[in-house]
């Protein structure tokens, strides 16, 4: 590693007294320039200016013959990396060198984490300045912070640079040694990575659990009870309670069953079926129940710590439906424009000035009683103290309220505002008083025949909201649960009170498979396992999606069959490389390098070549990564790793998913015409998730003719029309006649070229309401007629068409696409209706209707329009295109009926349009000056 203080070998210096400040981005440069004044020139490097070669063509000619050239790391010379200036950054480097000639000092003002320190070091090594170099570090972009950083620079942190370089080299060695194994044994263009492969394994392991899961059924009774019979003033007079015990034995609930549907402790609980639950309810008919006990307890809930990187990603995913990548992109903008502090941090601590700012703001907005009696300090064990900046909070010594910044961040930047508001709420709430309330637990008894039954009800009321005035934590929709401020009121009852039974409902349940990971829950899992670092989570999640290992279904992360094959290969032949504890241990050792407690050369040598000790003990002692790959490569059976056994059919024949070059397919051996075992195959659509591939589904796919089901002839062309199951779902297509060609031409390959250059058959994906086994010729011809010309826009003269795409039905006018609510609209929408859609402002991101509906329902009897269920910011909702109504607790997307959907819409219309809460009259307080913004 070069000495950062090296001078006299590059450009710079003319006695002008000016300073050059280099940052990563133009936005950051403009902001700093506005604060530093004319004595400083602020320019950006636009990210990293050099890196390891990305491809063989990037390797300089003099190194191409070296055995290590493909790695870009000289493994025989202390793992010296080969850095090249990125082609697109050469002009930037030239500009920076030119600016150095007119200044007397260089300030490297890149971010203060590993990555920022590395960028600063690369700038130093590339520019080779002959003038004094200083490292300028700040964690928020406000005028006081920037001026303080310029007045108190520090030296470059070489330990931090070493840590980043070690990670970069490690990831290069891991990726460039293991990825070629995947190319040879699974498929081209795949990649392996130190963290991405483990993240993929976590998701695959969860899907395996779902595939092995067996649901268990159980019943109980939901009772609606009336307390007014013994207390006319009871409030509320009616409430619900659930059956919890019969004849002294606890009634089984979902948590009493394991993942295979077996009772964990069968002798301690009673499992009710529909018949026994119905009989118990009948036995209670005409009786009263009695309050056996009523226990009321106070509770208090402390506020949550301010955000760090991982918790911001999790909560933005849950509350705002942002991906981890989107969250970090918006946070980067907010930071660079001076709205928040640095967004890559493992810390939950606040500075003294930030604590005072939060407490002052809470007092002004909510009153003295809402502020914690003493400042709250949040500490946690930080993996790397050198990266432990302050928590993510609003920038400045006084915080700009959401109302104050709304005007600046509204409109096209509304997502920036929403994330700022979330950060502001969490920060202010962290210094507020506890939320307080009461819980009430009721135990209610009765007799069903000769058996004593026990019902239970639990209520919760909030007596003092405390920090919940500012911030309410949400829950992951796929996991279930209630938000912090959810209340359930019960009447205040005393033992011995009699209760009338209003209604008894035998209630059936089934255990659910473990929920798939969402981006939020995957980030939480990675953090709990100590795998990766919060600053890398968003890029890891993006990578595993870009590589085709994972795709999203709603907000859930679903693994592909390729991910199953890759994970299986790595587990079987490179088990330690995807072991959770091993990967976490590597992270800890890399942090030791950052702290200066470990030499990176020794560590890399043990990992790559082997040794007697070091982080990767099992890898080091087996000869290192290089030997591990060499030994295993030839022994890997490609067919075996690309074969995932599902189950046996009813004849005991194993059914496999095979991962082929054209996608996954099903296969089993059946008796052929000669009696010999013959492979039977079936196309496997990507739309079928692994846990949905049951024996019944497999048999249906095997029964589907692979050449497709013939529907008939197109009366216009005479071409045969068939329906097929494809990789991307069921579709219809036409069979074109073979082009004519004489034998001589065919022998020379002309026929093959004619076919390639000839007309392509028309195809059309089936609508969601269609089924491969029942689709008709008429349906197919309608699909093949798309896109349908709706008409011509009289204003622009452009043609408007209705089409069906990967993300659902949509309109297209030139380059402007607008989503439709239902697939039927493709064939029914009129020009006037289309023009109305185009007259509305185009909505962006989650506000747009680009995502297909979760489910299509029937027609709403009130509006006469089709109803669909869509995925919205606050969860699933039903809409007829005019009225939106959120699904309520107990409503299930898969089973909700047309009648229930219409009921929700009718109820929403009856309540009228949503109204904004009236502003409270605020006490007059002296106005605080917000941080200066340009």
From Swiss-Prot:
Keyword Oxidoreductase applies: no
Regulation (activators, inhibitors): ssDNA cleavage is inhibited by MazF4. Relaxation of supercoiling is stimulated by DNA-binding protein HupB.
Ranges for region Interaction with DNA: 191-196
Cofactor: Mg(2+)
Gene Ontology molecular function terms on file: DNA binding; DNA topoisomerase type I (single strand cut, ATP-independent) activity; magnesium ion binding; ribonuclease inhibitor activity
Bilayer-crossing regions: none
EC numbers, comma separated: 5.6.2.1
Active site: 342
Source species, domain of life: Bacteria
Catalytic activity entry: ATP-independent breakage of single-stranded DNA, followed by passage and rejoining
Annotated Basic residues bias: 911-934
Additional free-text comment from the UniProt record: Was identified as a high-confidence drug target.
Protein's recorded name: DNA topoisomerase 1
Source organism of this protein record: Mycobacterium tuberculosis (strain ATCC 25618 / H37Rv)
Lineage of origin: Bacteria, Bacillati, Actinomycetota, Actinomycetes, Mycobacteriales
Gene behind the chain: topA
């Amino acid at each position: 590693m070069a000495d950062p203080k090296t001078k006299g070998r590059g450009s710079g210096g003319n006695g002008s007294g000016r300073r050059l400040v280099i940052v990563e981005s133009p936005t950051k440069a403009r902001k700093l320039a506005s604060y530093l004044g004319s004595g400083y020139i602020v320019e950006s490097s636009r990210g990293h200016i050099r890196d390891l070669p990305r491809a063989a063509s990037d390797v300089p000619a003099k190194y191409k013959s070296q055995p290590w050239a493909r790695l870009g790391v000289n493994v025989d010379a202390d793992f010296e990396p080969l850095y090249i200036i990125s082609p697109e950054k050469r002009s930037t480097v030239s500009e920076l060198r030119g600016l150095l000639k007119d200044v007397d000092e260089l300030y490297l003002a890149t971010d203060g984490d590993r990555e920022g320190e590395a960028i600063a070091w690369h700038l130093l090594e590339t520019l080779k300045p002959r003038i004094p170099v200083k490292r300028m570090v700040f964690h928020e972009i406000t005028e006081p912070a920037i001026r303080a950083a310029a007045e108190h620079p520090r030296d470059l942190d070489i330990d931090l640079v070493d840590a980043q370089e070690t990670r970069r080299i490690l990831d290069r060695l891991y990726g460039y040694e293991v990825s070629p194994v995947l190319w040879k044994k699974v498929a081209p263009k795949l990649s392996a990575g130190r963290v991405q492969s483990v993240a993929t394994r976590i998701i695959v392991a969860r899907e395996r659990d779902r595939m092995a899961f067996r649901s268990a059924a159980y019943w109980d009774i939901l009772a609606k009870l009336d307390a007014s019979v013994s207390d006319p003033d009871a409030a509320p007079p009616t409430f619900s309670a659930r059956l919890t015990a019969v004849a002294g034995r606890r009634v089984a609930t979902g948590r009493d069953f394991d993942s295979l549907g077996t009772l964990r402790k069968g002798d301690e609980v009673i499992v009710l079926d529909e018949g026994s639950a119905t009989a118990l309810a009948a036995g209670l008919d005409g009786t009263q129940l009695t309050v056996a006990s009523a226990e009321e307890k106070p509770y208090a809930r402390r506020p949550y710590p301010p955000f760090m990187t991982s918790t911001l990603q999790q909560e933005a995913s849950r509350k705002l439906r942002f991906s981890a990548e989107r969250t970090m992109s918006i946070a980067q903008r907010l930071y660079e424009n001076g709205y928040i502090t640095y967004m890559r941090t493992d810390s939950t601590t606040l500075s003294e000035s930030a604590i005072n700012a939060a407490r002052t703001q809470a007092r002004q907005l909510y009153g003295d009683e809402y502020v914690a009696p003493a400042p709250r300090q949040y500490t946690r064990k930080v993996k790397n103290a050198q990266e432990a900046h302050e928590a993510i909070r609003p920038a400045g010594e006084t915080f700009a309220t959401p109302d104050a910044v709304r005007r600046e961040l509204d409109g096209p930047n509304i997502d920036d505002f929403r994330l700022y508001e979330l950060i502001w709420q969490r920060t202010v709430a962290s210094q507020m008083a506890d939320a307080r309330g009461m819980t009430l637990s009721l135990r209610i008894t009765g007799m069903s025949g000769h058996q004593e039954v026990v019902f239970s009800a639990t209520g919760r009321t909030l007596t003092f909201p405390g920090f919940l005035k500012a911030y309410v934590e949400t829950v992951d929709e796929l996991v279930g649960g209630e938000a912090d401020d959810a209340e359930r009121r019960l009447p205040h009852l005393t033992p011995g009170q009699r209760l009338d039974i209003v209604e008894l409902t035998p209630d059936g349940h089934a255990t659910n498979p473990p929920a798939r990971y969402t981006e939020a829950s995957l980030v939480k899992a990675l953090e709990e396992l100590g795998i990766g670092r919060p600053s890398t989570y968003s890029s890891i999640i993006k990578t595993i999606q870009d590589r085709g290992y994972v795709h999203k279904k709603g907000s859930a992360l679903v693994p592909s069959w390729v991910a199953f094959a890759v994970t299986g290969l790595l587990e079987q032949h490179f088990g330690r490389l995807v072991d959770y504890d091993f990967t976490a241990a590597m992270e800890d050792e890399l942090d030791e390098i950052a702290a200066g407690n470990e030499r990176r050369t020794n560590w890399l040598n043990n990992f790559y070549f082997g040794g007697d000790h070091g982080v990767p003990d099992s890898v080091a002692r087996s000869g290192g990564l290089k030997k591990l790959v060499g030994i295993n490569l030839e022994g890997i059976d490609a067919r075996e790793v690309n074969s995932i056994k599902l189950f046996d059919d009813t004849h005991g024949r194993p059914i496999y998913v095979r991962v082929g070059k054209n996608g996954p397919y099903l296969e089993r051996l059946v008796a052929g015409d000669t009696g010999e075992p013959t492979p039977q195959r079936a196309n496997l659509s990507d739309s079928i998730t692994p846990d949905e591939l049951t024996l019944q589904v497999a048999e249906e796919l095997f029964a589907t003719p692979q050449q497709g089901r013939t529907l008939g002839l197109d009366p216009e062309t005479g071409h045969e029309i068939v329906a097929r199951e494809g990789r991307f779902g069921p579709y219809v297509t036409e069979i074109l006649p073979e082009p004519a060609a004489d034998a001589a031409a065919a022998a020379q390959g002309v026929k093959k070229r004619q076919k390639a250059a000839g007309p392509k058959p028309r195809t059309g994906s089936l609508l969601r309401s269609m089924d491969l086994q029942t689709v008709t010729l008429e349906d197919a011809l309608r699909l093949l007629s798309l896109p349908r010309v709706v008409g011509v826009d009289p204003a622009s003269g452009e043609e408007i068409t209705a089409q069906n795409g990967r993300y659902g039905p949509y309109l297209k006018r030139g380059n402007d696409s607008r989503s439709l609510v239902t697939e039927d609209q493709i064939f029914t929408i009129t020009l006037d209706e289309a023009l109305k859609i185009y007259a509305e402002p185009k909505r962006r991101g989650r506000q747009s209707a680009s995502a297909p509906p979760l489910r299509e329902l029937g027609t709403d009897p009130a509006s006469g329009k089709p109803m669909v269920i869509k995925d919205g910011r606050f969860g699933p909702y039903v809409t007829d295109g005019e009225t939106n109504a959120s699904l309520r607790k107990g409503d299930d997307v898969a089973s909700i009926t047309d009648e229930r959907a219409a009921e929700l819409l009718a109820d929403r219309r009856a309540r009228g349009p949503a109204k904004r809460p009236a502003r409270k009259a605020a006490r007059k307080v002296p106005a605080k000056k917000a941080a200066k913004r340009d």
